[in-house]
Regions:
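Short amphipathic alpha-helix that is part of the acyltransferase structural core
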Residues: 26-62, 86, 182, 186-189, ...
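Acyl-donor-binding surface of acyltransferase catalytic domains
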Residues: 1-31
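Conserved acetyl-CoA-binding loop of GNAT-fold acetyltransferases
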Residues: 7, 131, 157-166
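Conserved beta-strand-loop-alpha-helix junction that forms the acyl-donor binding cleft
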Residues: 143-153, 169-181
Length: 216
C-alpha cells in the first residue's frame, strides 16, 4: 500500500520489522501543530492524503476499496486509532496509526505528511506519538513500504525497524535485492550504513501466509 509519499522510483516491496522500539528517537511536535484523532466527517480527506494533489478517480476507487476491505468491518476501531496531525487552521497535514491484522500481527499503517510540510520533523513526531504507549504485548510491529520512501525508511530505522530479508512475506514477493540497490543509490551513505536486516522464521510468517494477511 502507498504508506508514505513516494519519490519517482520503482514500487517494489520492502517489509520491515521492529521488536524493540528505540525511544531515543522520539520527538515532540512544535506548537505550530497538534495531534488528534480522525473525525468521521473527514474520511474523504484522509483517503486523499497519500496522493497530495494527484487524487485521481482511479486513486479514489483504490482507497474506497482498500478502506472497505481493511477497515470497514472495524470502523469504530479505525476512528479510535487513526492519529492525524493538524496545523493551526485545523487542516489535516499528516496521518499514521497502528493496526492489528491478527492477535500477533501488529502493523504500522499509512504514514504520510503532506509534501509542503515535509522536512519539518513532523513525521518523526507523528511516529513518536503512535509508538509512545506501545507495550511489549504489542510487539513486534510490521510495515510495508517501497524504495521510493527512502526518507521514511531512514526514520523507521531510527525507531528500531529492520528490513526483513526473507524472499517472501505471505503471498507477496520481498524485492529485497532490487530495493537495497535503489536505497544505496538514493540514500546518503551515512544513513544507508545504519540499515539493519533480519531474517524471520516461525510463527509470524506462518500466520501471515496461512491467514492471507496482506493489508499492510
Amino acid at each position: 500500500m502507498p504508506a508514505e509519499q513516494q519519490e519517482q522510483l520503482p514500487e517494489e516491496n520492502i517489509f520491515m520489522y521492529c521488536d524493540k522500539v528505540n525511544e531515543g528517537a522520539f520527538t515532540k511536535l512544535t506548537n505550530d501543530y497538534n495531534f488528534r484523532y480522525l473525525y468521521r466527517t473527514e474520511l474523504e480527506i484522509w483517503k486523499s492524503l497519500p496522493f497530495d494533489s494527484d487524487y485521481t478517480e482511479a486513486n479514489k476507487l483504490y482507497m474506497a476499496d482498500y478502506y472497505n476491505r481493511a477497515y470497514k468491518i472495524r470502523e469504530n476501531e479505525f476512528y479510535a486509532k487513526c492519529v492525524v496531525v493538524c496545523n493551526k487552521d485545523n487542516e489535516i497535514i499528516g496521518s499514521c496509526f497502528l493496526w492489528k491484522l491478527d492477535e500477533k500481527i501488529n502493523t504500522l499503517h499509512w504514514l504520510k505528511i503532506k509534501k509542503e510540510y515535509e522536512g519539518k520533523g513532523i513525521g518523526r513526531a507523528l511516529i513518536s506519538k503512535v509508538l509512545e504507549n506501545i507495550e511489549e504485548i504489542d510487539l513486534p510491529v510490521f510495515l510495508h513500504t517501497q524504495p521510493g520512501s527512502y526518507r521514511a525508511i531512514k526514520l523507521y530505522c531510527d525507531f528500531g525497524f529492520k528490513i526483513i530479508s526473507n524472499e517472501k512475506i505471505g503471498n507477496r514477493i520481498n524485492n529485497i535485492d532490487k530495493c537495497i540497490t535503489k536505497l544505496e543509490e538514493n540514500m546518503p551513505k551515512k544513513y544507508f550504513k545504519k540499515i539493519r536486516y533480519i531474517k524471520l522464521s516461525g510463527e509470524y510468517l506462518d500466520i501471515i501466509e496461512e491467514k492471507g494477511l496482506n493489508d499492510f
